[in-house]
Structures are given as structure tokens and as C-alpha cells.
Amino acid sequence: MDWEIKKRGRVTYYRKKSNELFSDLVVEELDNGDLKIRFVGMTGALAATNELSLNEVARMDPEREIPRIFDTWEMYVREAGICESLAELDFLEIHSFGAAPKGPSPITEPEKYAAEKKRIRQDYSQAYANYWKEKMPDNGLPVRFTVYLEELPDVDASYEFGAVALLQK
């Protein structure tokens, strides 16, 4: 990754040079040498597909989106030289933003819309739980804040995550 890195005191900002809006990682060095890492908000649809150079967008598909988010963050911490795996981190918080289904129409097909919303939320819960069980079984579970919105900036995404994690030295 072609990072622009700025260090200001105990805080290091990692930003892709193509991104002039926000940092992709912000790392704070704590007094005891541990690192507190804040991860960029990421979707598993367009954003992760592009970052991971995948051919197929996971559109409104939490089972594929959720692992892609974590895979992108893992790539970031590796490329930034912070650690090799997300399993080395203790995630403190996950901020999850869920989007409404893109179809069917809630006006013309309310029952089908409700069923699709239920499917997406169930798939999200299962994919999220499976990720921790399969990839980080020895780690504790972070607190999670989930908010549902009408739409995300990535219109193909069902969820966007942000996170705070700790690398204990």
C-alpha cells in the first residue's frame, strides 16, 4: 500500500495518497507502549472489493461482506507494519451501520421487503459471529454498536463497520 504517514507526538496517521478525506488507520501509542488502533469505516461491497482487488461485488450480501471488511483491515495493519494478523489485536469496539434493503419496494411489496430486511440482519449476525469463531476464537468479543440507516454512501453495501482495537505489547 502506498501510505502517506504522519506522526504527531504519540499519534500516527496512515492514509492512502489517493484519499484526501480521512485516514485509513489512526494509531495512538499509549503510555505502556500498547497501540490503540482506530480503523476506517469500511464496507464489504465496493470498498473492500476494490481494496482487495476482487472481481465480484458482494451486493447486499453480509455473508461475503463481513469477512471482506476484516480482510481489508488485516491487509492494512500488515502493510502498515503494525502486526501480521487481526488475531493479534484485542478489538474493543465495533461500530456497525446497517442499510435498508434496496428491494423489493416497501410500498408495493411490504411483506417481501420485511422478509428481505430480516434475511439481511440474520445473515449479518451469522457472518459476524462466524468470523470471530473461525478467525479469532481466542479473542474476547468487542462491544458492538449497531445503527440502521436508510442508506450508506456505498449503495451496494448492507453494512459499514468502524472499529477500535488494541495491540498489547
Show where each model-derived region lies.
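Short, positively charged
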Residues: 7, 11
